[in-house]
């Protein structure tokens, strides 16, 4: 493998572990002598460009007794081999990518070896061996339909009629939901969603957290219909909803360092989840939910309507229930909502309901005549806390509205920029209509001075925190 060409030497000189990288490349050459090392410009998903090395070549795949060559490309980051390659298929103009469990619609390859990369235990040769094994189970390429009678060759002539049943959100696909996080909240979310009977398949992905848990193992022992337990993020491919319950908490850390730990954990899972299920709605339940929903949106590069947090949905449902029991709201055409940050700064407002419907038409601030009632009800819900099982029920409520396209209103964490004069990119709980494509935020409302101050304080705190976080 020629690493002495001027373009390669120029780029390689900027690599942090040059000698180790060259040694790893030589190992690849001994097993795959046709692989070529080249210099190129890599463009990331956020349009940033960087000069990197890339491995280009074919890997041999045997499918049903026949051997085929699969063209691939591996981008090597400047911290290679201590960071995994970014792997893509290299289809020609006559090829079509077969989106599946290990390949997304853009041809990016997702494998356990990449997710669990740990050099020197991990190597490119081992990665390629796993890639070959996965592609032998599920061929990743086919041919495009040709009006000119072109003769397909190699793998394409054999797999052009194969139907890949996994990956992507197609109209005829089963309703699949994935819960990422194996702690008590993850288990509660799984059981609550299953009780709603609104999904065909539910995947619980158990990722490492700084907590003691045994529920995931119990689910594996006492298996439930429609529930799959996995440790591989790729099992979530093709999900309609991705629920993130994972937390990396520690009582020994400062608040900033605890949040940063969660941000770092998200960096390892959110981008890949978004790539595996690009049409999914992300429902964030990690804490602090307002901050982590913002982080998930930034890291996933999804539309803001596709990323929501559980936010004040539970508090809103509790508040409404308490007020309805008092028989005050039954004849007023109003419903109580909790909005803002999930903290002491959350705010209660009224929602005007459409005549004879459950559709929210507009929000109104609490008037002097209804303030005593609202204050008493608000104090009652503050003491109830947010235990795993209750948050799990709230997650199921939100998930049900999304997968059944109910167009129901929930107070969920969403991008608040532009709502009620908020000028910063922050996430707060606001009433949103939820459906299969995500959330639609309802118009803002003029709040009283005290409530307005609470919202502004929440915005300022979030802005200040994000200035200190490493995303």
From Swiss-Prot:
Similarity section: In the N-terminal section; belongs to the ubiquitin-conjugating enzyme family. UEV subfamily. In the C-terminal section; belongs to the LDH/MDH superfamily.
Subunit structure: Homodimer.
Gene3D superfamilies listed in its UniProt record: Lactate dehydrogenase/glycoside hydrolase, family 4, C-terminal, NAD(P)-binding Rossmann-like Domain, Ubiquitin Conjugating Enzyme
PANTHER family (alphabetical): L-2-HYDROXYCARBOXYLATE DEHYDROGENASE (NAD(P)(+)) (PTHR43128), UBIQUITIN-CONJUGATING ENZYME E2 VARIANT 3 (PTHR43128:SF33)
Domain named UEV: residues: 2-145
GO terms of molecular function: oxidoreductase activity, acting on the CH-OH group of donors, NAD or NADP as acceptor; ubiquitin binding
Entry keywords, A to Z: NAD, Ubl conjugation pathway
InterPro entries in the record: L-lactate/malate_DH (IPR001557), Lactate/malate_DH_C (IPR022383), Lactate/malate_DH_N (IPR001236), Lactate_DH/Glyco_Ohase_4_C (IPR015955), NAD(P)-bd_dom_sf (IPR036291), UBQ-conjugating_enzyme/RWD (IPR016135), UEV_N (IPR008883)
Protein's name according to its UniProt entry: Ubiquitin-conjugating enzyme E2 variant 3
Superkingdom, taxonomy of origin: Eukaryota
Binding sites annotated in the UniProt record for NAD(+): 183-211
A Pfam family hit: Ldh_1_N
GO biological process: carboxylic acid metabolic process; endosome to lysosome transport; protein modification process; protein transport
Keyword Ubl conjugation carried by entry: no
Alphabetical list of SUPFAM superfamilies matching this protein: LDH C-terminal domain-like, NAD(P)-binding Rossmann-fold domains, UBC-like
Primary role: Possible negative regulator of polyubiquitination.
GO cellular component: ESCRT I complex
Keyword NAD listed: yes
């Amino acid at each position: 493998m020629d690493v002495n060409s001027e373009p390669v030497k120029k780029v390689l000189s900027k690599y942090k572990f040059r000698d180790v990288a060259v040694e790893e490349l030589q190992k690849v050459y001994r097993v795959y002598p046709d692989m070529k090392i080249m210099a190129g410009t890599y463009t990331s998903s956020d349009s940033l460009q960087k000069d990197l090395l890339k491995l280009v070549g074919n890997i041999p795949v045997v499918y049903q007794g026949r051997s085929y060559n699969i063209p691939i490309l591996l981008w090597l980051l400047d911290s290679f081999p201590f960071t995994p390659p970014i792997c893509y298929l290299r289809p020609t103009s006559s090829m079509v990518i077969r989106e599946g469990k290990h390949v997304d619609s853009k041809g990016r390859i997702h494998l356990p070896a990449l997710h669990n990369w740990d050099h020197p235990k991990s190597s490119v040769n081992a990665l390629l061996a796993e890639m070959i094994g996965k592609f032998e189970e599920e061929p990743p390429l086919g041919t495009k339909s040709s009006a000119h009678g072109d003769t397909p060759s190699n793998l394409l002539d054999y797999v052009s009629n194969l139907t890949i049943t996994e990956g992507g959100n197609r109209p005829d696909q089963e309703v699949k939901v994935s819960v990422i996080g194996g702690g008590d909240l993850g288990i509660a979310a799984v059981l609550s969603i299953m009780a709603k009977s609104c999904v065909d398949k539910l995947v619980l992905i158990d990722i490492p957290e700084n907590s003691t848990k045994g529920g995931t193992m119990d689910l594996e022992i006492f298996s439930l219909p429609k529930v799959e337990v996995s440790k591989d993020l790729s099992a979530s491919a093709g999900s309609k909803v991705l629920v993130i319950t994972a937390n990396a908490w520690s009582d020994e850390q400062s608040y900033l360092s605890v949040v940063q730990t969660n941000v770092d954990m998200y960096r390892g899972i959110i981008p890949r989840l978004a790539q595996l299920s690009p049409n999914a709605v992300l429902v964030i339940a990690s804490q602090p939910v307002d901050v982590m929903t913002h982080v998930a949106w930034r890291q996933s590069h999804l539309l803001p309507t596709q990323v929501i947090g559980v936010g004040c949905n539970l508090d809103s449902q509790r508040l409404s229930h308490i007020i309805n029991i008092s028989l005050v709201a039954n004849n007023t055409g109003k419903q109580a909502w909790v909005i803002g940050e999930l903290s002491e700064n959350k705010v209660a407002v009224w929602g005007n309901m459409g005549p004879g419907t459950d559709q929210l038409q507009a929000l109104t601030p609490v008037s002097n005549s209804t303030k005593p009632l609202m204050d008493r009800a608000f104090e009652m819900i503050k003491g109830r806390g947010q235990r795993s099982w209750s948050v799990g029920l709230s997650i199921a409520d939100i998930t049900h509205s999304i997968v059944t396209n109910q167009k129901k209103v929930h107070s969920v964490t969403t991008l608040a920029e532009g709502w009620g004069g908020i000028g910063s990119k922050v996430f707060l709980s606001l009433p949103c209509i939820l459906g299969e494509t995500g959330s639609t935020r309802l118009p803002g409302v003029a709040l009283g001075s005290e409530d307005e101050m609470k919202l502004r304080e929440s915005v300022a705190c979030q802005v200040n925190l994000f200035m200190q976080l490493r995303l």
